[in-house]
A protein has these predicted regions:
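N-terminal capping segment at the start of a domain
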Residues: 2-3, 9-37, 138-139, 328, ...
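Short coil/turn connectors at secondary-structure junctions
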Residues: 76-82, 133-135, 169-175, 197-201, ...
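Active-site metal-coordination/substrate-binding segment of hydrolases
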Residues: 78-174
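Midchain, well-structured core segments that form catalytic/ion-binding scaffolds
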Residues: 111, 135-148, 181-305, 309, ...
Length: 428
């Protein structure tokens, strides 16, 4: 096994800070690809840095905004290619003038983020900080997010690539890497060039602590309900008025009372009314449906149709219309058919002394769209925490550990050649 000191932590930290300073906040209201110019700027930086590192075929593809590169196999074995993927955009939070702050040899106490705003990063509020004692912790200055989601993943992939390039005697198969746009708004991977990428499977490095592997996600849909009322003067309304507000309330009352985000965790799903506008004459509801269990997910979609049909049956003509847009499918249904992908990562965790944690991801990742395109893609980790806000942080050591895991997965793929661990994986 490689040693953690075999990895260039200085390069990893420098690249992370350089990339973090680029504003790559994605914009759900934009219709360009990518949605913001900062993502193009960073993609071209990543392309150049890959070339400088020694990845000769690295290229930025304007048609999909992905940067793709590969490390050719040096093995005489007929090894399938493995992919590693990270995203370049950041969440919908201030990303202008990001100034990463490095705190060497973190002592376990409070970290002052911004004295003027009296903002501190405290282990009392964020207990996972205690795991970073003695490490080089990188934080915000309290005015922006940091962008460890997912620039920590980007930097870690660079660290793994450099390991192989500086250790040419280490046997490996083809390694493909991809860095893409607009993950935070669920668009980027829809354009992922799966045929060109051509790996048997891949991993995203999107959030989470060392040892984490997320091999299942929600099934997800969004629903739009439009209600047509009949508005008349209240004094003359008998037998005439149809109050769209009342119908909207009837719909919401028919939804499962306990299947809401504030009452669900682990493998429990939910139906959430995200917003509503309502007058007597018309009402509009937007909902999201999230569920791990595919059969229950289908039942919940059917339930919405039943509720709408039941109301419409009370009137001479339909008053309520329902449109459902299916957003992504649970990758677990596919990953269960390919247990080697999860076992490969778990075996590496055990070898490195990392405690594994198979957790359901209560959301979606780029892996959903990529899996749907034929490349099973669970999520690992990037070592950061408190994503999407001013308390976000990561450590140089955690990113370096991520690089080591990436490298060892590639090497374990060689070691298991001809005798893969295909034992069933229990996800739930």
């Amino acid at each position: 096994l490689s040693e953690i000191t075999d990895y260039d932590s200085k390069l990893i930290e420098e690249l992370f800070i350089k990339y973090a300073k680029v504003n790559t906040r994605s914009d759900a209201n934009s219709h360009t690809v990518p949605t913001t110019v900062g993502q193009v700027k960073l993609a071209k930086m990543v392309e150049k840095d890959l070339h400088d590192l020694g990845i000769a075929d690295a290229k930025y593809e304007p048609e999909n905004s992905y940067v793709i590169g590969s490390l050719p196999s040096n093995s005489d074995k007929d090894l399938s290619a493995i992919g590693f993927i990270a995203h370049l955009d950041t969440a919908d939070y201030n990303a202008e003038n990001i100034q990463p702050q490095v705190h060497p040899n973190y002592d376990g106490g409070e970290i002052v983020l911004n004295a003027e705003k009296q903002m501190v990063l405290s282990p009392k509020e964020f207990p996972l900080l205690k795991h970073y004692v003695g490490q080089r912790v990188i934080t915000t200055d309290g005015t922006t997010l940091l962008g460890a989601d997912d620039k920590a993943g980007v930097a870690a992939i660079f660290g793994a690539l450099k390991y192989f390039l500086t250790h040419p005697d280490v046997e490996h198969g083809d390694v493909k890497v991809a860095f893409g746009p607009d993950e935070e708004i669920g668009r980027g991977a829809k354009r992922f060039p799966a045929k060109e990428f051509g790996t048997e499977f891949a991993y995203t490095l999107d959030n989470g602590q060392p040892g984490q592997i997320e091999a299942e996600t929600f099934n997800a849909s969004e629903a739009k309900i439009d209600i047509r009322g009949t508005a008349v003067h209240p004094g003359d309304a008998y037998g005439l008025m149809v109050n769209a507000v009342t119908l909207a309330n009837e719909i919401m009352s028919a939804l499962p009372k306990d299947e809401v985000p504030e009452k669900s965790r682990d493998h429990q799903g939910f139906i959430l009314v995200t917003d509503m506008t309502a007058t007597v004459g018309e009402a509009h509801l937007n909902l999201i449906i999230r569920e791990f269990d595919t059969q229950k997910y289908r039942r919940n979609l059917a339930l919405l149709h039943q509720i709408v049909d039941r109301i419409n049956d009370q009137y001479d003509s339909p008053r309520v219309s329902l449109k459902i847009n299916e957003q992504y499918q649970n990758i677990g249904d596919t990953v269960k058919q390919h247990p080697y992908i999860v076992n490969l990562a778990l075996n590496v965790y055990h070898q490195l002394g990392i405690t594994p944690s198979i957790t359901p991801f209560r959301g979606g990742t780029d892996g959903n769209a990529i899996t749907a395109k034929g490349i099973p893609t669970p999520n690992l980790f990037n070592g950061g925490d408190n994503f999407h806000g001013p308390y976000e942080y990561v450590s140089t050591e955690a990113m370096t550990k991520t690089a080591q895991v990436v490298s060892e997965i590639v090497q374990e793929h060689v070691r298991e050649y001809g005798h893969r661990d295909e034992s069933p994986v229990k996800l739930n």
